C-alpha cells in the first residue's frame, strides 16, 4: 500500500512538471513571435531612460579603469549599453 502512495505521488509530481514545462514553452514561443525588433525597441526605450543612461556611463567608466580585464568588460559594456 505504501508503495502505491509513493507511485501516485511520483505521478502527480511528474504531471505538474510537465504542465510547468508546457507553460514555459508557450511563453518562449510568444517571445520568439514577438521578434528581435521588439526586443531592440524595448532596449532602446530603457536606454533612453535617464537612470539607465547614468548606469551606462558609470559602467563604461568602470570598464575603462578595469586594467587587465578591460577587454572582456568593454565587450560586456557594448552588450549592456551598445544602444545607448
Swiss-Prot record:
GO CC entries: extracellular region; membrane; other organism cell membrane
Signal peptide region: 1-22
Main location: secreted
Disulfide feature: 47-84, 56-77, 63-81
GO biological process per UniProt: defense response to bacterium
Site (The hydrophobic side chain is located at the binding interface of DPC micelle): 55, 59, 71, 73
Top-level taxon of the source organism: Eukaryota
Site (The positively charged side chain either protrude into the micelle interior or reside in close proximity to its surface): 50, 52, 54, 68, 72
Subcellular location: Secreted; Target cell membrane
Database matches in InterPro entries: ShKT_dom (IPR003582)
Pfam families on file: ShK
Prosequence residues removed at maturation: 23-44
The entry's keywords: Antibiotic, Antimicrobial, Cleavage on pair of basic residues, Disulfide bond, Membrane, Secreted, Signal, Target cell membrane, Target membrane
The keyword Zinc-finger is annotated on this UniProt entry: no
Residue intervals of the ShKT domain: 47-84
Keyword Chaperone annotated: no
Family: Belongs to the sea anemone type 1 potassium channel toxin family.
Cited function: Antimicrobial peptide with modest activity. Active against the Gram-positive bacterium L.monocytogenes (MIC=22.64 ug/ml), B.megaterium (MIC=10 uM), B.mycoides, B.subtilis, M.luteus (MIC=40 uM), M.phlei, and S.aureus, and the Gram-negative bacterium E.coli (MIC=7.66 ug/ml) and P.aeruginosa. Shows moderate affinity to the negatively charged (POPC/DOPG 3:1) lipid vesicles. The peptide interacts with the surface of DPC micelles by two alpha-helical regions. It does not interact with the zwitterionic (POPC) lipid vesicles, which model membranes of eukaryotic cells.
Entry text on domains: The peptide interacts with the surface of DPC micelles by two alpha-helical regions.
Record protein name field: Antimicrobial peptide aurelin
Organism from which the protein derives: Aurelia aurita (Moon jellyfish)
Amino acid at each position: 500500500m505504501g508503495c502505491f502512495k509513493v507511485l501516485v505521488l511520483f505521478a502527480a509530481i511528474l504531471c505538474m512538471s510537465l504542465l510547468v514545462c508546457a507553460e514555459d514553452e508557450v511563453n518562449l514561443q510568444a517571445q520568439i513571435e514577438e521578434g528581435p525588433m521588439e526586443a531592440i525597441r524595448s532596449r532602446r526605450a530603457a536606454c533612453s531612460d535617464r537612470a539607465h543612461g547614468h548606469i551606462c556611463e558609470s559602467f563604461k567608466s568602470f570598464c575603462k579603469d578595469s586594467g587587465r580585464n578591460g577587454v572582456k568588460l568593454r565587450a560586456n559594456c557594448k552588450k549592456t549599453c551598445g544602444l545607448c
